[in-house]
Every structure is written in structure tokens, then in C-alpha cells.
UniProtKB/Swiss-Prot annotation:
Ranges of Low complexity composition bias in the record: 193-204, 562-588
Database matches in Pfam families: Helicase_C, HSA, SNF2-rel_dom
Originating gene: SWR1
Binding site for ATP: D696, E697, M698, G699, L700, G701, K702, T703
Residue span, Helicase C-terminal domain: 1221-1371
Function: Catalytic component of the SWR1 complex which mediates the ATP-dependent exchange of histone H2A for the H2A variant HZT1 leading to transcriptional regulation of selected genes by chromatin remodeling.
Residue ranges with Basic and acidic residues bias: 148-163, 174-190
Residues in HSA domain copies: 321-393
Source species of the chain: Eremothecium gossypii (strain ATCC 10895 / CBS 109.51 / FGSC 9923 / NRRL Y-1056)
GO biological process, one term: chromatin remodeling
Keyword presence, DNA-binding: yes
Name of the protein described by the UniProt record: Helicase SWR1
Compartments, record wording: Nucleus
Length: 1486
């Protein structure tokens, strides 16, 4: 074969290969050959990737061996080595020609496709050149048959084995022109003959050129062979005698061809399974990546997301589809035929089933039709029967409905009759209750008909008035004798206390009625309470009725001429201040229920004052004594009309008073007048077997009155308990301290702690006289109610009893069932306008009441109570006019009469003359120089002006808080710094120390060359006469070792080890180690010899020194005179350093105040010459360092004062104008014997006050929010009892529950709190019951600052509700009326034109709690924590009374005048009447 023929054939094969690969690529991409263009050559990147992925790329092999022949690797290497470098140019030219031929074939194919009808002859191809025209020899290459090799590779895909593998051409090696086809399966078979199987190509083109016969001659050039590896078709059985060749040659190979999963599968199936699993895994990964799937950590699984989740996850969008069609599985024609047959078979079967189903349906319809025709008569009969049953059912239901209606009508009529009967019985019950209340009130009051009694009462009042203010003011202070007696009582046993106070019952007091009925009824106090009966004769009842009627008429006549009706606004107000004040009223007034309680208490209190008032009317010094009751209270009394049965009878008004009881000796301290009256009232309750409510205003001493009652029972009635007192948690310890203070003779058990501690306290408490009083909280008494119910209590006292007004709560039910003899409720809150709450308290007091006939009757139920009093009282509250009907007023009068015996309430306004006065002072303080500088600097900042102009509430509050800090103390705004010097490790001198040494060294380099030491050369011989003796010189000359030394040197020089001949001993040979060591030794010994020679020379000169005369001769001829006079002038001038420091210590302390700006640490070392660069001998340096380490530094104090400067302690006071004023005020208070409380809002101010008080040496105590409740009680008790403590500094946020600081008479507000309620609580801690001196309140205000502006505006706008303190809260009116200009002044806010208020948010204005939270954001963290702790203490009490169930409150706005209800049964016929009579006779239920 010639070279041209070979190139042409190669080009033909390359062209066929390209056609096949294009066709495969088109099928892969589009799954159809409909639009396939065989003339188009793909050169895109996707086509190259397709060839690479399918392993169809065409590359050149370097195998030069003949196909079908096996050659050894050695022979191949030899041929390669021989042919190296040859044929490279020929191969490149051949490849170039092949490409041109392939391109020409594509051009011919495009031309044929464009002109399919034209016939073209054989074209003569264009030769590329001379080299292409040169023919190869015919015998250069021998024709060989093509060998088809099959390679086996288990790792390739099975789908690619079905299609014939095309030929791949790869021009990798230009040296070899052998081509092969790479099949992905990689299967190899043995060699086969060319006649058995031949390779084939499948192409869509039918135009093929005839095969050119090649010459069989062998050429000398290296043979380029084509190695084709094709995939042969599978063996098919075409004859029964045909025997298939087994695929596996052995059994082992056959077994290895299967894989075992759940069952045995073939390799192909296994590969298919693996491929499918890979696709599933890739799909899952793609789903996770695109966001369609998600991984659930909890279930450890992959979950699909919903459509909503897919819409929300916009970040993970699926990738766009890159192909239009998926690759379909390629089936053969036989497979398509089989599938078509299966589909047609199924279609025929479905049609058959459909025809059968339609036939069955038609037959069923025919059958149903004939059945319907046959059953028409029977069906008609059944429908008629069904219709009749429906009519009968409707008739029965109508009759039954009518009977039900008649039954309801009968029940309504019967209920009306029962209600009528109940109203009659209720009126009878109410009459009995009113009669019983009259009896109780009459038993409490004692008629003073006898003139002797009147005289004794006058004497008693004069004795009481003669006690004076001094005796009245000693309620909170104990005399020494009383304290000693209290201590003795606390040490006595119960039997000794009984013996000590047993004789007190025989003591009689002047003015006490010995023959009264009440006294005779209480002679035997140990009888059962049920045995006490309230009995009055008919004459006494009538007389008492006439007395009340006459009293009412007289007072109403007086009030009619002096009082005026209230306005509508005054009637509708229900604030605590009006409920607690005395209200004038007449017959046309509109009294509310809240005012009824105050009026009842006032009437009772006024009745108690009648006898005293008459006895004191002739006393000239009534006002000085302070015992006369308030004249305004008497003039403003209200007594509603009490209509009795006997209206015709009337008598003169008699003076009535509560029976006076003696003050028990067991009580330590003196009761005030109103407290003594309260004790009398409580004692009358006990004597009349009645419970009551002590409702005095907060701060009037309900605790001391209760303790006095228990002491009275112990001393007078010999009733030592046990008593149960239930109080809020926060005041439990306060009650215990009050018992120890006023009644130390009682054994008090404070029941609190953990369950184990409470169990330990209950151990043995059933023994006689184990304790007298048990104090516990509401929460614990309900928790341990089973233990408390088993014990019998003499008195159960509830503090803050208004919190048990909910009768549906479990606490109310539990306390109601306690085994108690008497009950007392203490409350300082006015009772609300709620009939249900009022009934709850009254029923709790009187669940059972004794009657005249010895029977026990319970209190009225809630329904009856609301029926009697509910609607009239609601009508009064909701009324807009001043006139009411007589029935309403009579009902209110009855309510007065019911409540009058059980309630006592006094206000501070009634007893204000018996309390010390309160004075308020405002001290304006000037700002210090530093404060003024910081204040003006902060206000002049651009940021501050922008913040104030912004109008943001929180930003403005933050600015105001900073200004308040400057006013309180500048250290709160900016701490005065501690001055220290800037410390440097090295000074400037150390940088030039080395240079200085170098310069000195260079300057003195030749100094020794020109200067001759005459002393060393013995030329200065005259100096030897002053320090040398002749004997010493002779001895040195005689003892010198000159000869021995010179011999040793010569011997060393002539040592045999030293080489005598040496060229230059200073030059060392570093190339040879031996020579180097020898030369180095010679140099060392020569240097040593020179040193010894010089030493010998100097020693000779020293030994040859001789004096001319000698010092011994000079001493011999010298004459000594008398010693000179001693003088200490020089010793005074040369004092030691330590002495000078001690002498000038005062100067150092006072004037060593200027701290240098910068200091260095190496100055001392440089000055002493101890640095490393100093020219001092190391031995001398070491000696100096040793001496300095042993020496105490005399300059330590001076160095310390100059290195650090602390602010002077006096600057703490002089930096603040308030502290300067406080220093003057405290000095004056200390001299006058006063004790002060200093309150501040900020916790950091307490730290500054501590430093201030320590600086001045005042003894003080501190209480802030971090102080525990137990420690707080101890601190307050110590302050009240220790007069040495002058000052008590407190935080206004430290909580005010149970704090009583009556030991102080001065209150100083260092700064004002945002919440005015806090300031009022702070005042009440000092100005309360128990205070014996006038209270002065000082408020510090910085002038010309925000504080003075706030105070000025507050005073201008302060009216009734401008700053309202209600229920511990404060209104936002304070901030809603003030603007920035009002707070900072017009001078500071000239640039702010808007005068909007600080707080404009309506939500914040309506919610005070929200305002408190906003203000807390501007305060310090410590202050916020303190406020939270205070609120937490309040929440503890709130949790004691918090219940989930609430009592239904009747609406006061409910319309009383209801529309008349239409009578449903009006005009009933005779049938309905018959039905009702039938039901009434009871026949319906038989």
C-alpha cells in the first residue's frame, strides 16, 4: 500500500468515525434523528465533554508491533530505541494530509446533500504536496487481517454495552500512526481470524466509497496499523443444534458473577442497582441543595417541605433545566413489538370487562324497574302509616310543650308566693337584727344618771387633762422603772405572772361604774361565749329608742340651719381623702356607703366624748391640755334618722359613754387619749361577747391598741390566751418587736420558717401556757390550717383585714372555720361601696349570734343582705339628685343601725392635735465652682442641646438625670482623678551614658603616656616621711624575694616544651590543629612571662622605697600642745539625713504636693554610678548595692507623696454645695440634741455620705436596698434605742414596710425622688404614732438649677390632683404639664422654641407602671435593683391576699328604675287555668 492510499484510507476511517460520534451526540442530546445533519461537524465544548465522558476520544498509540503478534517488552524497547527521532516530520505531514482529506469529504457530503439529484463522478483529490505524491514501495508493508479485540472491564456502565463502540482517534503521538478504538466496557477476547468476524460501522449515510485494495508488499518504513476494538453482537440461538459458548470458563468465575443482597443477583443487576441508588443519592443531594428537601435533626431523617415552605425559601432556588429531553432507554425493534403486543392485549381485556359491566348494569336496572312496579301498593300503605305517626308525634309534642309551659307558669307563681313569704320572713329577721344591734349598742353604752358618776367622770377627765403634753408624748419612750419592770416580767414564769397580776381585779378606779349592767355581766369571764345573752327590759328598750329619736331630731335641727347640700361632683368622689374626712349632711344629703362607716365611727366616738366634753366645758385651759375633742368634728357630725316603733314617746337626750377600763399594768408606755378610747371600745366588745372592726387610719396605732386589749384581758380577765394574730409577711417581725417593746410579759411565738422549723415550733404547743400569743402570716396559716384548727384560740386578730373581703376564697373559708372565742379585724383602708364585701366581713365576724331565748342564730345570708341594703345603697351612689325617697333613707338608716356596734374608725384629722407638729423647710444650696463648671459645660454641649430640642422623653430624662448627678455631687458625674506621674523605664541620660563613657575614654586615651607617676618610680621620696617608718622600709627591702622570682621566670622561659625558634608567635596557623594549639600555647606563656616581669619590676620599686627621716623620727622630735576648744557648729550643720527628714516632716507633708509630670526609674542608679556603663569597679558596685539593700530608704515618704497625689478629703465637702450646707446643719442638730434621717434616691450618694460622715466623725447607720428584712429590723431597733447614733442614711428605694424610725425628729431629703409617694413614705417613717417631738423636714435644693425650677413650677401648679398619691402610685400629670423650659429655665433653652410637655404618649400617661419602667432606664443599675427589691417586698404581701376568684360587684351604674315586665300569663283561658289547677293539686307528678 502506498503512502497516499494509506492516508486516504485513514481519512475515510476518520470521516466515518466523525459521522458516528456526531450521530451518537445528537441522539444523546435530542433522543431523535429527525433533525440530524451529518454534514455538520461538532466543535463545541459540550461535544468534547461528551467524548471525554463516554471515553470516545481518538488518540495515537506508539505500539509499532504487528497486530496479532506477541512481542516481548525487550524487543519493543529495542525498536523504539532504533526508531527514536525518525518519522516525526513524516507523521506530522501525514496527519495534516488526513485532516485535509476529512475536510474534503465533509465538503463533498454537504454538496451531495444540497444537490441530491445530481450525479457526480469520482473526484480527484488534491495532493497536499510533493511529499504526498511520493508512493510507498509495494513491499514495504504486508497486509494483515484486522483483529477485533474485546476487553473486559467490570467497572463500566451496562447501557453502553448495547451500542457498537465507534472508532476513536486521538493525535497524541506524532511518531506512531496506529489508531485504536476505546470501548467503555473494556472486554478483551482472543485473537480471531479476519474471515470469521469483521468490524462494521452503523451510519445514517448510504453513500460509501468502495474499499481500495491495498498492496501486500512490505515496506521498510515502520508499519502504521489500525487497531479496532468493537463490541461484537451477542450470541443468538438460530438452530437447536447451536451450542452457546459459555461466558464463564469455570464454576468459580460463574459464582463470582453474582452478588448477594437480599437475594442473588447478577453483576449487571447489581451494577444497575448501584447506579439507581447513586441517582437517588444525587437526587437527594440536589433536593437538599435546592431547598426542596430538609434534614430533621430530631427524627434523623430527610423530610420534604410543603408548598408554603418552598415559597418562603427564596434563597435556595432549583437549578434551571439544561436539557429539553431526557435520555430515553433505547429499545430494539423486538422490544417495541413485545411492548406493543402487551399494550394491545391489555386494551382488549379492558374493553371486554367494560362490555360485561355495562351489560350487568342494564340487567340490574331492568330488574329494579319490575320490582318497583310490583311493590307500589305496599309502599303506598307504608307511606300512609308513616304520615299518621308523624301527625301523632307532632300532636303529642304540642300537648307536652303546653303542659311544660303550664308547669313553668305554676313554678313562677309558686316562686312569687315563696318570695313574698321570704320577704315577710326577711323583714322579721331584719327587725330581729335591728333589735339585736340596739341591744348590743345599749350594752356597750352605760347611762350616767347618777350625779356622783358625773362628778367622778369630771374628776377623771381633769386628772387626765392634768397629765399634760409631757405624759401624752411619752407613748413611744419607756421610763427606766418601766423598762426594769418589763425585763422582770419577761424573766417571770406564767404562774408568777398570774400571781403578780391576780390582785388587780379588786382594784377600783374613780369614775368607773361599779353597778352597771355590763360590769355585772362580765364578772365571770371564763364562761362559754354562748352563755352570754344580751337582755334588756322593755322599759330600757323604749327608753333607748326615745333617746336615739330625740338625739336625731336635735342634731338634725342644728344641721339644717348650718349645712348645705353637696354638689354632684362631691357626691361622686370616692377618693380615700374624702372617705376619711367628716362630711356634713342633712335630710337632703346623699351619703355613700363609704361615708357611712366614717359617720358611724364618728357618732360612736362623739358619744364617747359627750361626758368628757361637758366635764371640760368649765376648764379654762382646754386648748392647752389637748384633751378636748375636735370642735369641727362635733359640728360636722351626721346622724341619720332612726325611725322606731314608738314615735310618740320622747325623752331628754342623755349623755352616753363607753365604759372606761383601766390601763393594764402589763402594758409598757402611755396611751394617748384616742388610743385609750379605742381600748375602752375593744374591751366593751369583749364584755358584750361581740366581735368588731378597728378601722383607724394608718398610723394611729392599731397595733398598740391591740396589744393593750390583750394585756387588759390578761390583767383584768385573767385570760392569757392563747391568741392568734395573722398579719402580712412583711410586718411579722415588726409585730414581734412591738410585743417585746410594749408587753414583754407575753410569751410570743413567731410562727414562720421552713416546714421543719414550723414542725419543731408546734412540738409541745398544746401544753398549758406554752405561749400566749402566736403571730403568723396569711400564707402559713392557710398552709398549716389543719394544725391551727385543732387548737382553741381565745382571740383571732387579722391585720390588714380588708384583703379577706372575698368570701369565695379558700383563705376566707379556712379562717372562718377556726375554733376561736372572739375575732377582731384591723384595717386602715376605707371600706368600699360593695355590699358583698361588707357582708363578707360582717359574716366573718358574726357567723353565729346569741338570741334572747338562748338560741343561736346565724347572720343573714348574702341574698337577703343584698335585698335589704343593696339596691338602696346603689341608688344613693348612682343618684344625681340630692332628694331621695323615704324608703331609701329608712333603709340606709337601718344599715347605720346594723353597722354601728361593730365598727370604730378615727382619722388623723380627728386626733391631729394629739400628734406632734410637722414643719417643712427648703434649703437652697449654691453650686460649688466645680459643680457650676460641670453644669455649664454639660449644658453648652451641642449634643445636649440637640437632645433637648428633639423632644424624646427618654433622651430628655437621661439629660435631666446627668444634671441631677451634678447637683448632688460632681463625683457622680465625673470623679476627681488621682494624679500620678508618667513613669519611664529609662531617662534621657541613659541614652547618652555609653556615648559619655566613650568620649571620656577617648579623651583620656593618651593621658597616661604624658603623665609620669613619681610616686611609683620613687622620685617623690619626700612623701615617704609622712607615712613610712625606717624600720618598716628596712624590713621590706630585706624580705623581698627578688632572686627566687627571677629564677622562676627564667626557668619558665627555658622550659623544654617551648620551641625556641619561632618566626612569629603572634601569627597562628588555623589550617593545622596541632600547629594552632602549639602557637596558642606559646602566645599564652609569653604573655604570662611579660606579666610576671612587669610585676617583678613594680615590686622591686615598692620594696626599695625609703624615707629620708622616717615618721618615727618626726614623732620623736614633735612637741604636742593642749587640745583646741570643741565647737558643735559643724555638727549642727552636718546632721544625718534621717534627722533632717524627721525635723522637716511637717514641711514635707504640707508642701510635697506637686506631683511631677514624668519620672524615670533609673535616675537613682545613674546618680550613684551603679549603671552598667559607669566607670566604677564591679566590686565597688557590689558593695554599694549591698549597703543600700540593708539601709532603710529615708526618701520613701517623700517619693510616695510626689509620685501619687490623692484628692484631699476636704474636697469631698467643698466640691459640693449640698454637703457644705449639710455640714452646717448637722453641726447645729448635734449641738441641739436632734437626730436626723437623710434620704436620697441614688445609692452612690450613700457612699459619698458615708465618706462625709466618717470625715466629720459622726456615728451613723446605713440602710439601702441590699439590706435584708431581718437586718433592717435590727438596724431600726438599734437606732431607736441608741441615742449616740446621730444620723441614719437611707435610700428612698429601700422599702418602707415595717420601718418605724421615731427615734429621729429630723428628716433631710438630700434629693427629691421622681415618685412623690416615696418622699411621703419617708416622712411617715419619722412622723407617725410614737413620735414625741416636732418633726422638721429639710429639703436640699440647688439654686439656679433644674432642681429649683422643678420645685418652683411644682409649687405654682400644686392643686388637689396635681401630684396625687394614691395606693403607692404617682400620676403622670407631673410630667404632662412640665416642658423642657420649665425644668431648665428660659436662659438655658433659648434655642428651643417648642414648649411641648415632656410626656405626650397617651399610653404612658395612662399607665403609671410604664412611666416607672421608663424612668428606671435612666437610673443607675444599683438604684433599679433597690427599687425592684422594694416592689418585690410589696408583691410578697400581694401574694398573701391574691385569689383567683373574685366577688361579683354590683354595678352602680345599673338602672334602678326597670321597665315593667309584660305579664306572659295575662288573660289565660279556662284550659290554662284548669292545667294550672291540675298541677297545683299534684296530679301531674303522681
Amino acid at each position: 500500500m502506498t503512502k497516499a492510499n494509506g492516508a486516504e484510507q485513514l481519512a475515510d476511517w476518520k470521516f466515518q468515525y466523525d459521522l458516528l460520534t456526531n450521530e451518537l451526540f445528537h441522539l444523546h442530546e435530542f433522543t431523535s434523528l429527525l433533525e440530524f445533519d451529518p454534514a455538520f461537524r461538532h466543535e463545541s465544548d459540550s461535544f468534547a465533554r461528551f467524548l471525554a465522558d463516554k471515553h470516545l476520544e481518538l488518540r495515537m498509540e506508539e505500539d509499532a508491533g504487528a497486530p496479532g503478534l506477541e512481542e516481548s517488552s525487550a524487543m519493543r524497547r529495542i525498536r523504539r530505541r532504533q526508531k527514536r527521532g525518525r518519522g516525526e516530520e513524516e507523521g506530522n505531514a501525514l496527519l495534516k494530509g488526513v485532516e485535509e482529506l476529512v475536510e474534503q469529504k465533509y465538503a463533498d457530503l454537504r454538496a451531495r446533500l444540497d444537490r441530491p439529484m445530481l450525479k457526480q463522478g469520482p473526484r480527484k483529490r488534491k495532493q497536499p504536496g510533493d511529499a504526498a505524491k511520493t508512493a510507498l514501495p509495494h513491499d514495504s508493508k504486508k497486509r494483515k487481517s484486522a483483529v477485533v479485540r474485546k476487553e473486559t472491564n467490570d467497572e463500566e456502565h451496562l447501557k453502553e454495552e448495547k451500542s457498537a463502540s465507534p472508532t476513536v482517534w486521538s493525535p497524541e503521538s506524532p511518531q506512531r500512526d496506529t489508531y485504536r478504538t476505546i470501548h467503555p466496557s473494556g472486554d478483551h477476547e482472543g485473537y480471531q481470524s479476519s474471515s470469521s468476524d469483521s468490524f462494521y460501522f452503523t451510519t445514517s449515510s448510504e453513500d460509501e466509497e468502495p474499499t481500495v485494495k491495498r498492496s501486500l508488499k512490505r515496506k521498510k518504513a515502520p508499519v502504521r496499523r489500525i487497531k479496532l476494538i468493537v463490541h461484537p453482537p451477542k450470541q443468538t440461538v438460530t438452530n437447536p443444534l447451536h451450542i452457546l459458548k459459555p461466558e464463564c470458563s469455570s464454576l468459580h468465575e460463574f459464582l463470582q458473577s453474582y452478588k448477594s443482597l437480599d437475594e442473588d443477583i447478577s453483576i449487571e443487576e447489581f451494577d444497575s442497582y448501584i447506579a439507581s441508588q447513586r441517582k437517588v443519592v444525587s437526587a437527594i443531594r440536589k433536593g437538599l441543595k435546592s431547598g426542596v428537601l430538609t434534614y430533621d435533626r430530631h427524627t434523623d431523617s430527610i423530610q420534604g417541605i410543603s408548598l408554603k415552605d418552598v415559597q418562603n425559601s427564596q434563597a435556595n432556588k432549583p437549578e434551571p433545566i439544561t436539557t429539553f429531553y431526557q435520555e430515553q432507554e433505547k429499545h430494539t425493534l423486538r422490544d417495541h413489538l413485545n411492548n406493543h403486543g402487551v399494550v394491545m392485549s391489555r386494551m382488549f381485556q379492558d374493553r371486554k370487562r367494560g362490555r360485561i359491566a355495562r351489560a350487568r348494569k342494564i340487567s340490574q336496572m331492568i330488574e329494579q324497574h319490575f320490582k318497583h312496579v310490583a311493590g307500589a301498593e305496599e309502599r303506598k300503605t307504608k307511606e300512609e302509616e308513616k304520615r299518621r305517626r308523624a301527625l301523632a308525634r307532632a300532636a303529642v309534642q304540642a300537648v307536652k310543650k303546653r303542659w311544660n309551659l303550664a308547669e313553668r307558669a305554676y313554678k313562677v307563681l309558686k316562686k312569687d308566693e315563696e318570695d313574698q313569704l321570704k320577704r315577710i320572713q326577711g323583714k322579721e329577721h331584719l327587725s330581729k337584727m335591728l333589735e339585736q344591734s340596739t341591744q348590743l349598742l345599749g350594752a356597750q353604752l352605760n347611762q350616767n344618771d347618777d350625779s356622783d358618776d358625773e362628778t367622778s367622770s369630771q374628776v377623771l377627765s381633769e386628772n387626765e387633762s392634768s397629765l399634760g403634753d409631757e405624759e401624752m408624748s411619752s407613748s413611744s419612750e419607756l421610763d427606766d422603772s418601766e423598762v426594769e419592770a418589763g425585763e422582770d416580767d419577761s424573766k417571770l414564769t406564767v404562774e408568777q405572772l398570774r400571781a403578780k397580776y391576780s390582785a388587780l381585779e379588786h382594784i377600783t378606779i374613780d369614775g368607773r361604774s361599779q353597778n352597771s349592767e355590763v360590769s355585772s355581766m362580765t364578772e365571770n369571764p371564763e364562761e362559754d361565749p354562748q352563755e352570754y345573752k344580751i337582755l334588756l327590759s322593755e322599759r330600757e328598750k323604749a327608753e333607748l329608742h326615745r333617746t336615739f329619736e330625740t338625739e336625731e331630731n336635735n342634731i338634725l335641727d342644728e344641721d339644717h340651719s348650718s349645712s348645705s347640700s353637696f354638689s354632684e361632683s362631691e357626691i361622686s368622689q370616692t377618693s380615700s381623702s374624702e372617705n376619711e374626712s367628716l362630711i356634713n349632711s342633712n335630710s337632703s344629703q346623699t351619703p355613700g356607703l363609704a361615708s357611712l362607716f366614717g359617720n358611724v365611727a364618728e357618732e360612736l366616738s362623739d358619744d364617747a366624748h359627750y361626758s368628757t366634753e361637758e366635764s371640760l366645758s368649765s376648764t379654762p385651759n382646754e386648748d392647752q391640755e389637748g384633751v378636748q375633742p375636735n370642735a369641727d368634728a362635733v359640728s360636722n357630725m351626721e346622724i341619720d334618722s332612726l325611725e322606731m316603733q314608738d314615735k310618740d314617746e320622747s325623752t331628754n337626750l342623755e349623755k352616753l359613754s363607753v365604759v372606761d377600763v383601766p390601763v393594764p399594768p402589763l402594758l409598757r408606755g402611755t396611751l394617748r387619749t384616742y388610743q385609750k378610747q379605742g381600748l375602752n371600745w375593744l374591751a366593751s366588745l369583749y364584755n358584750n361577747n361581740t366581735n368588731g372592726i378597728l378601722a383607724d387610719e394608718m398610723g394611729l396605732g392599731k397595733t398598740i391598741q391591740t396589744i393593750a386589749l390583750l394585756a387588759y384581758l390578761a390583767c383584768e380577765k385573767e385570760n392569757w390566751g392563747p391568741h392568734l394574730i395573722i398579719v402580712p409577711t412583711s410586718v411579722l417581725l415588726n409585730w414581734e418587736m412591738e410585743f417585746k417593746r410594749f408587753a414583754p410579759g407575753f410569751k410570743v411565738l413567731s410562727y414562720y420558717g421552713s416546714p421543719q422549723q414550723r414542725k419543731e415550733k408546734r412540738r409541745g404547743w398544746n401544753k398549758l401556757d406554752a405561749f400566749h400569743v402566736c403571730i403568723t402570716s396569711y400564707q402559713l396559716v392557710v398552709h398549716d390550717q389543719h394544725s391551727f384548727k385543732r387548737k382553741k384560740w381565745q382571740y383571732m386578730i387579722l391585720d390588714e383585714a380588708h384583703n379577706i373581703k372575698n368570701f369565695k376564697s379558700t383563705r376566707w373559708q379556712a379562717l372562718l372555720n377556726f375554733n376561736t372565742r372572739r375575732r377582731l379585724l384591723l384595717t386602715g383602708t376605707p371600706l368600699q361601696n360593695n355590699i358583698a364585701e361588707l357582708w363578707s366581713l360582717l359574716y366573718f365576724l358574726m357567723p353565729q349570734t346569741a338570741l334572747e331565748n338562748g338560741k343561736i342564730s346565724g347572720f343573714a345570708d348574702l341574698d337577703a343582705f343584698q335585698q335589704w341594703f343593696g339596691k338602696p345603697v346603689d341608688k344613693i351612689i348612682a343618684a344625681n339628685d340630692s332628694e331621695h325617697d323615704d324608703e331609701t333613707r329608712r333603709t340606709v338608716s337601718k344599715l347605720h343601725q346594723v353597722l354601728r356596734p361593730y365598727l370604730l374608725r378615727r382619722l388623723k384629722a380627728d386626733v391631729e392635735k394629739q400628734m406632734p407638729a410637722k414643719y417643712e423647710h427648703i434649703l437652697y444650696c449654691r453650686l460649688s465652682k466645680r459643680q457650676r463648671f460641670l453644669y455649664d459645660d454639660f449644658m453648652s454641649r451641642a449634643q445636649t442641646k440637640a437632645t433637648l430640642a428633639s423632644g424624646n422623653f427618654m433622651s430628655i430624662i437621661n439629660c435631666l438625670m446627668q444634671l441631677r448627678k451634678v447637683c448632688n455631687h460632681p463625683d457622680l458625674f465625673e470623679v476627681r482623678p488621682i494624679l500620678t506621674s508618667f513613669c519611664m523605664d529609662r531617662s534621657v541620660m541613659s541614652n547618652y551614658a555609653h556615648l559619655n563613657q566613650l568620649v571620656l575614654k577617648n579623651l583620656n586615651k593618651h593621658a597616661l603616656d604624658t603623665v609620669v607617676n613619681l610616686q611609683c618610680t620613687n622620685l617623690a621620696f619626700t612623701q615617704n616621711d609622712f607615712n613610712m617608718e625606717t624600720h618598716y622600709a628596712d624590713s621590706c627591702a630585706r624580705l623581698q624575694c627578688v632572686r627566687q622570682f627571677s629564677e622562676a621566670v627564667e626557668k619558665l622561659r627555658k622550659d623544654a616544651s617551648l620551641p625556641d625558634a619561632k618566626d612569629d608567635p603572634n601569627v597562628l596557623n588555623y589550617q593545622d590543629m596541632h600547629e594552632f594549639y602549639t602557637g596558642y600555647t606559646v602566645r599564652k606563656r609569653l604573655r604570662l612571662i611579660d606579666q610576671y616581669r612587669h610585676t617583678f619590676y613594680l615590686n622591686s620599686l615598692r620594696c626599695e622605697k625609703r624615707p629620708v627621716y622616717g615618721i618615727n623620727l618626726v614623732r620623736l622630735v614633735s612637741v604636742h600642745h593642749r587640745p583646741p576648744l570643741e565647737c558643735n557648729v559643724m555638727s549642727e550643720l552636718m546632721k544625718p539625713l534621717e534627722t533632717r527628714l524627721v525635723t522637716h516632716k511637717r514641711i514635707i507633708d504640707e508642701f510635697a504636693i506637686i506631683t511631677p509630670t514624668a519620672i524615670t526609674l533609673d535616675t537613682r542608679v545613674l546618680s550613684l554610678g551603679l549603671d552598667s556603663e559607669a566607670a566604677v569597679h564591679p566590686v565597688i558596685k557590689s558593695d554599694i548595692n549591698t549597703q543600700l539593700s540593708r539601709m532603710k530608704n529615708p526618701f520613701h515618704l517623700l517619693q510616695t507623696k510626689l509620685s501619687i497625689a490623692f484628692p484631699d478629703k476636704s474636697l469631698l465637702q467643698y466640691d459640693c454645695g449640698k454637703l457644705q450646707s449639710l455640714a452646717v446643719l448637722l453641726r447645729r442638730l448635734k449641738e441641739e440634741g436632734h437626730r436626723a434621717l437623710i434620704f436620697t434616691q441614688m445609692t452612690k450618694v450613700l457612699d459619698i455620705l458615708e465618706q462625709f460622715l466618717n470625715y466629720h466623725g459622726y456615728l451613723y447607720m446605713r440602710l439601702d436596698g441590699a439590706t435584708k428584712i431581718e437586718d433592717r429590723q435590727i438596724l431600726t431597733e438599734r437606732f431607736n434605742t441608741d441615742p449616740r447614733i446621730t444620723v441614719f442614711i437611707l435610700s428612698s428605694r429601700s422599702g418602707g414596710l415595717g420601718i418605724n424610725l421615731t427615734g429621729a425628729d429630723t428628716v433631710i431629703f438630700y434629693d427629691s425622688d421622681w415618685n412623690p409617694a416615696m418622699d411621703k413614705q419617708c416622712q411617715d417613717r419619722c412622723h407617725r404614732i410614737g413620735q414625741t417631738r416636732d418633726v422638721h423636714i429639710y429639703r436640699f435644693v440647688s439654686e439656679h438649677t433644674i432642681e429649683s425650677n422643678i420645685l418652683k413650677k411644682a409649687n405654682q401648679k400644686r392643686q388637689l390632683d396635681n401630684i396625687v398619691i394614691q395606693k403607692g402610685e404617682f400620676t403622670t400629670d407631673y410630667f404632662s404639664r412640665l416642658s423642657v423650659k420649665d425644668l431648665l429655665g428660659s436662659d438655658e433653652t433659648e434655642e428651643i422654641a417648642d414648649e411641648r410637655p415632656l410626656l405626650e404618649d397617651p399610653a404612658t400617661t395612662a399607665d403609671s407602671k410604664k412611666l416607672e419602667r421608663l424612668l428606671a432606664q435612666a437610673e443607675d443599675e444599683d438604684d433599679v435593683k433597690a427599687a425592684r427589691l422594694a416592689m418585690k417586698e410589696v408583691d410578697v404581701d400581694d401574694r398573701d391576699f391574691r385569689e383567683s376568684s373574685t366577688c361579683a360587684n354590683p354595678s352602680p351604674d345599673e338602672d334602678v328604675d326597670e321597665e315593667p315586665v309584660e305579664d306572659e300569663y295575662e288573660g289565660t283561658r279556662h284550659v290554662e287555668e284548669y292545667m294550672i289547677r291540675f298541677i297545683a293539686n299534684g296530679y301531674l307528678y303522681d
